[in-house]
């Protein structure tokens, strides 16, 4: 049995934000824009990094809490829409693969492993980031938070991603959270 044969049975699932790609600078720019539309300052980039991973709305809420700002439901919705509008138009200005990830992806591809993305980004935003970074063709499946029955940290999200990739959960590995 060759190593390639073993790898061809594997499904390697990556988290996107903070694992595969460093999206924090572009998320921060969108957050600053959204908060400025309401006459507010946003948190700094290092603080923002700890709020990433549970979706834009949660990031906005955590950011406001860090600044001791109580948001009304209307303010949250306004900030969320301003954030998304800006982010969609500017999502890969500064976003890049983390160091070593290009080599990691190529390592998996050279061994015929199936690769997939399991992310708390929406499906459309995840696909847009992958497309703009010329990564779409490396992944057999992408499952965003809005296309799963239970988003991460639920294991259901991972299981559904592996299934979408036509993999087996006992032959899958998750890289990221």
Task: List each language-model region with its residue ranges.
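Active-site neighborhood of HAD-like aspartate-dependent phosphohydrolases
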Residues: 2-50
């Amino acid at each position: 049995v060759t190593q390639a044969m073993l790898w061809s049975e594997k499904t390697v699932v990556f988290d996107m934000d903070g694992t595969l790609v460093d999206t924090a600078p572009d998320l921060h720019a969108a957050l600053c824009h959204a908060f400025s539309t309401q006459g507010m300052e946003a948190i700094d980039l290092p603080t923002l990094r700890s709020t990433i991973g549970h979706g834009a709305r949660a990031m906005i809420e955590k950011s406001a809490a860090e600044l001791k700002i109580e948001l009304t439901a209307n303010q949250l919705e306004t900030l969320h829409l301003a954030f998304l509008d800006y982010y969609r138009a500017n999502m890969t200005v500064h976003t890049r693969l983390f160091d070593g990830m290009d080599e990691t992806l190529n390592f998996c591809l050279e061994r015929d492993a199936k690769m997939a993305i399991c992310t708390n980004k929406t499906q459309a935003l995840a696909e847009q980031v992958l497309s703009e970074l010329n990564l779409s063709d490396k992944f057999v499946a992408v499952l965003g938070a809005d296309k799963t029955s239970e988003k991460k940290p639920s294991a259901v999200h991972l299981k559904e991603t592996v299934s979408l990739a036509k993999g087996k959960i006992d032959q899958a590995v998750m890289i990221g959270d």
